[in-house]
Regions:
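Intrinsically disordered, low-complexity N-proximal targeting/linker segments that flank membranes
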Residues: 1-77, 81, 85, 90, ...
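Active/binding-pocket-proximal capping segment
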Residues: 284-313, 331-336
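Short hydrophobic alpha-helical membrane-embedded segments
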Residues: 80-86, 103-111, 285, 302-310
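Alpha-helical tandem repeat RNA-binding modules
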Residues: 96, 143-144, 291-295, 339
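A cross-kingdom feature marking solvent-exposed beta-strand/loop segments within repeated
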Residues: 97-106, 150-155, 299-304
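Hydrophobic alpha-helical transmembrane segments
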Residues: 96, 116-123, 314-322
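Helix-loop-helix transmembrane hairpins and adjacent membrane-interface loops
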Residues: 89-100, 115-118, 293
Length: 438
């Protein structure tokens, strides 16, 4: 077994990429086309939920135009991901051939960053999803890679994680309610009432205690609080239970002695645990119940402040799952929500129709930069580099993502390094001639 960092030291670092590690026995260009084919086929499978999920959820409203749009989105994601991944590995060959050896940052990090530039052609929706997922993985990886007092607290203190998740929950739900942030989050906020609704609430507040109580409105309108709460619980169970069932079916291996598909599925279902269902249910229950109670007992507070407190309290549902990845994901999404608010403020302050101040060109330029694509490229460079060099800092979900978008190529490279001794790698290199083309 060879420590991955030994790749950058003699004698391995001076071997040609067609001799060992990368693509022994075949040329660089052939390696690129092989990767492009394998990544395209693997991507059709890995990204199939992008096609199947809309067809299932929108089966009643699906028409020809919607289907073609969904299919186009799916195929574009598969193609550009395959191109980016294949080009990244081909850039490893280019850097090796130009520099004459494998170097630390020109072997994995820089080739990946360059190859990921094909993601500029990816649909914005998919790009934002990839940027969020990889940013969460990088944040968690950095916490594991650089252990100190602060990172240990963030990784191992449940109370700290819960408090920060609650803060992030309040920020995200607040900006989703204002329609500033429109992407994924675990909970949908109740809608913000119109000015006419607030006027009605103010008038109702002056009604005497013996008046008809049905006239009073809560944050959710005219429906009863019990129905508002029950609807949230139903949505939580509808979202969480399928995820837990899928997790039970996909996680782990089939127990030994299971004969037949039905027996294997039943054995898998026995491992069912309501992890996500419990999280969604508790999140919805705490968030919606606290919203009603705050409106009832602290109605003198502003509606936005009430909602911020309800969103904060709802985040305490983190205690049910207690996973670092949930905390890191919430931090990334909260930053995205704050950034979206910043962009809106910049647009409003520089609008010549509503503002008398001169436009701030620096802020306008900063707002228009596609940071999601830039950050994603850097994220992928970090993740691929550490997949080979510091495998333990990446979580299982990240490893699966990298295997999926590279058709297991990153895993093959790592296994070829770690599962062979130094002598075996040298012997493999000597047994293969240098092939620079095909």
């Amino acid at each position: 077994m060879v420590v991955p960092s030994k790749v950058f030291e003699p004698p391995i670092c001076v071997n040609h990429c067609s001799q060992s590690i990368l693509h022994p026995g075949i040329g660089c260009l052939r390696y690129f086309f092989n990767n492009l084919l394998n990544n395209s086929i693997g991507g059709l499978k890995y990204f199939s939920p992008l096609l199947i999920t809309p067809l299932v959820l929108k089966s009643k409203t699906m028409n020809k135009d919607m289907f073609l749009s969904t299919l186009k989105y799916y195929l574009k994601t598969v193609f550009w991901t395959a191109m980016a991944s294949s080009t990244s590995f081909y850039c490893i060959c280019l850097f090796r051939n130009i520099l004459g050896r494998f170097l630390k940052y020109t072997t994995l990090f820089m080739p990946t960053v360059l190859g990921m530039q094909f993601f500029w052609f990816l649909p914005d929706k998919a790009m934002k999803l990839f940027c969020t997922a990889t940013s969460q993985a990088v944040y968690e990886g950095l916490l594991r890679q650089y252990p100190n007092t602060m990172t240990n607290i963030l990784l191992h203190s449940t109370l700290t994680q819960t408090f920060l998740f609650m803060v992030n929950s309040a920020i995200i739900l607040h900006y989703k309610r204002l329609h500033v942030y429109k992407e994924f989050w675990f909970m949908q906020p109740y809608p913000k009432m119109k000015e006419s609704d607030y006027e009605q609430l103010d008038n109702n507040a002056n009604v005497k205690e013996n008046s008809n109580p049905s006239v009073m409105k809560c944050v959710h309108g005219h429906i009863k609080c019990s129905k508002f709460l029950w609807d949230g619980l139903k949505i939580g169970m509808a979202c969480g239970i399928p995820m837990d069932l899928l997790s039970a079916l996909m996680k782990g291996k089939v127990p030994k002695g299971c004969k037949g598909l039905g027996t294997a599925i039943w054995a898998k279902l026995k491992t069912f645990r309501p992890n996500m269902a419990g999280f969604f249910v508790f999140y919805a229950a705490i968030y919606r119940l606290s919203s009603c109670l705050l409106h009832k007992y602290y109605g003198h507070l502003s509606a936005d402040l009430q909602h911020l407190v309800a969103g904060f309290l709802g985040g305490s549902a983190y205690l049910w799952v207690n996973k670092v990845s949930f905390y890191t994901l919430s931090t990334v999404i909260a930053i995205q929500a704050l950034w979206d608010q910043f962009c809106i403020k910049v647009s409003q302050s520089n609008d010549s129709k509503t503002s008398k101040r001169k436009p701030n060109l620096a802020l306008l330029l900063l707002k228009d930069i596609s940071f999601s694509r830039i950050v994603f490229s850097l994220n992928m460079g970090y993740l691929v580099h550490n997949f080979i060099i510091n495998y333990e800092v990446l979580n299982g979900l990240t490893r699966g993502f990298l295997d999926g978008v590279t058709s297991n190529q990153t895993k093959i490279i790592r296994d070829s390094i770690t599962q062979n001794s130094l002598e075996e790698l040298v012997a493999i290199a000597k047994s293969n001639a240098v092939k620079t083309f095909l």
